[in-house]
Curated annotation (Swiss-Prot):
Record text on subunit structure and interactions: Binds ribosomal protein uS19.
Record-linked NCBIfam families: 16S_RimM (TIGR02273)
Keywords assigned by UniProt, alphabetized: Chaperone, Cytoplasm, Ribosome biogenesis, rRNA processing
Species of origin: Brucella canis (strain ATCC 23365 / NCTC 10854 / RM-666)
InterPro entries: PRC_barrel-like_sf, PRC_RimM, RimM, RimM_N, RimM_N_sf, Transl_B-barrel_sf
Protein name: Ribosome maturation factor RimM
Gene3D superfamilies: PRC-barrel domain (2.30.30.240), RimM (2.40.30.60)
Similarity remark: Belongs to the RimM family.
Chain's role: An accessory protein needed during the final step in the assembly of 30S ribosomal subunit, possibly for assembly of the head region. Essential for efficient processing of 16S rRNA. May be needed both before and after RbfA during the maturation of 16S rRNA. It has affinity for free ribosomal 30S subunits but not for 70S ribosomes.
Length: 189
């Protein structure tokens, strides 16, 4: 299969692991080892990567790719994003509160009054729960928690996510703390 026509990011390659060409991989699959079930993976330029071996080591997945046989070759892959074509995803239905990250990118974030706070430009998980990055032309990107309180509704047909500005930290809280300084920690729904 050539470069995916409708790419879905499945993983990103991290640092080299050991001296035999293995790499650490951050996966975006429910089961981290499921990355090996999709066959060939592709980078943004369309280069194919075949997984020969994958295993979990502590909190990361260690992968050995075909043709990557030493540490230097492994180090050269650091930061490479890996994709599959959307058609390779399982046909099973997603739960109501499950989404493909790629489907959220580009949605406009609006409050109940229709005020725009930018568009979803990325989704991050730094260990404390998912965060949505909102970008607005001429402004610095903002991170908001991806919780039911902060993002109570997602409407793909309208191309929007509804945000609750107080819960998302977009406006001052009841104690007049500036946005993003309320001291509250985001929680996963």
């Amino acid at each position: 299969m050539p470069r995916p026509e409708n790419p879905i990011q499945l993983a990103v390659i991290g640092a080299a692991h050991g001296t035999r060409g293995e790499v650490r991989v951050k996966t975006f699959t429910g089961d981290p080892l499921a990355i090996a079930d999709y066959g060939l993976l592709y980078d943004e330029q369309g280069k194919a990567y075949e997984i020969l071996e994958a295993r979990v080591a502590k909190t990361v997945v260690i992968v050995r790719f075909k043709g990557v046989n030493d540490r230097n070759a492994a180090e050269a892959l650091n930061g490479t994003e890996l994709f599959i074509d959307r058609s390779q995803l399982p046909d099973e239905e997603l739960d109501e509160d499950e989404f493909f990250q790629t489907d959220l990118i580009g949605l406009e974030a609006v409050d109940g009054d229709g005020k725009s706070y930018g568009v979803v430009s990325a989704i991050f998980d730094f260990g404390g729960g998912d965060l949505i990055e909102l970008s607005e032309k001429g402004k610095r990107p903002m991170l908001i928690p991806f919780t039911e309180a902060a993002v109570p509704e997602i409407d793909f047909d309208k191309g929007i996510i509804k945000v609750e500005p107080h819960a998302a930290g977009l406006i001052a809280d009841e104690h007049d703390n500036p946005p993003h300084e309320s001291g509250k920690k985001p929680k996963k729904p």
